[in-house]
Amino acid sequence: MTLLAPTSPLAALTLLRYAPRGVPGALLRQGLESMQLARTPGLRFFRLLGTARGRGFGPWEPTRWAAFTVWDSAAALDAFEAHSRVAAGWRARAVEQWTLRMRPVRWHGAWGGVDPFAGFTPGAEDGQGAAAPLVVLTRATLRLRHLRAFRAAAAALEEVLARQEGLVASLAAGEVPLLKQATFSLWQSGAAVRGFAYAGQRHAGVVQRTRREGWYSEELFARLRPLSASGTWDGREPLSALLAPGLN
């Protein structure tokens, strides 16, 4: 695992699970939290996201929400977690929370018209090699006319992912249901990611079709190195088993 200096920029994914009775409040707070986050020192980019059930693009899961954030430094994220009303509210109201800190190593594309990782220095997976764990982020704005084809392809790929060796955890999220979607997946290694991306005929075929038919008006693809995690996701902390003893 790479140890990150307090002044180094980083990204984070926070998953929040609420009790069913807390869902209406979570919905109502989205707008207020967005305004507060927009004024947070050191926060370069953020998106508050709903999530789908299971690992793929299933029905909406109203009890689980996600926040993807990009920070000027680890110190800025530390200060947010220690002093922000938003972070305090998450801790007080969520029945489960998991935060993963990451450093992007390769990416291309845009999210909402901007590069969320502008200012980061790309690296060849930071020299850790193909055996180190990796996070994959995909994000796309789907053209409405391709919605039916996308849903059919997503259902087929979800079946493949369920059997994919090396996939530790994954989820689908979105800003706008069906049309503005993202996926996050945690893999045992970069080698496992490449095995899925390049050896899987069904996945490769879908990727080629999206480009040929122009499914997306905007897309982003990124690989990130997981650095540390806190809390639990569905009752477990999935990153710790992938890191060398004593480094997490």
Stretches with model-predicted labels:
Residues 70-73, 188:
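Extracellular/lumenal glycan-associated surfaces
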Residues 214-218:
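Flexible helix-coil linker/hinge segments at domain or subdomain boundaries
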Residues 1-57, 61-62, 74-80, 93-180, ...:
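Short S/T/G/P-rich N-terminal loop/turn motif that feeds into the first structured element of a domain
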